[in-house]
Amino acid sequence: TKDFEFFGRYVEYTDDSILTLATADAILAGRLSLVADYYVRYAEAYPSPMGGYGNCFQNWVIQKTRTGYAPAYNSCGNGSAMRVGPVGWAFDTKNDTMNAAKVSQATAMCIFLARKGASKDEIQQCMEQEFGYRFPLTIAELQKRYSWNGVDGEGNGGICQDSVPQAIQCALQATDFEDAVRNAISIGGDSDTIGCITGSIAEALYGVPANMCEKAMTYLPENFQKLVTEFEAKYGSGLRKTEGR
């Protein structure tokens, strides 16, 4: 359902928030090529967030901490797609955005295109042509047919190909930022990650009401608030001065 309290009693920042901020920190420092070190540092500093880190990611952090080296594990999980949002704001050409995002290109490209004024139809066309994504179902149909096991139980909602298209669709088929996030939560599955991906795209598409930004910031520790402020001051944001619902 889309009918839930947006800032409820048990709201906390999650692993998705932490690693998204780690990406932003690496970009601000001009060290995106060393972003893996930032992920390890943040994961060690915040080891038990709501949502929890994926098993493959945790094992990768442990190996890198113990040995100083851990190869990319070539995950097809959706974690990479949820933490790439800052890339879509920090680069000003399509090629630079794609190169920086690498395996999480679809999310970053949606943000980049929205920033540059592309219509929702143009963004969908790009996703279909460049990534092979298809969007045959409405949000109402996804609410009935989507779960942790993908659409109709024929997939895996924890991997990119069975969650990123749905997250993009939740943003494109919304009327504003809040509606997009409500779409994402309502379809079920890996809700915090789908919500993170959808929200990052929806910010660039619709903007975020000022009162909603202010409320969300109260859930973050002071150092996270400072990082968000610095990143937005340098690269911009989707902040709207108008109030939300």
Where are these regions (language model features)?
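Structured, active/binding-site neighborhoods that engage oxygen-rich ligands
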Residues: T1-R245
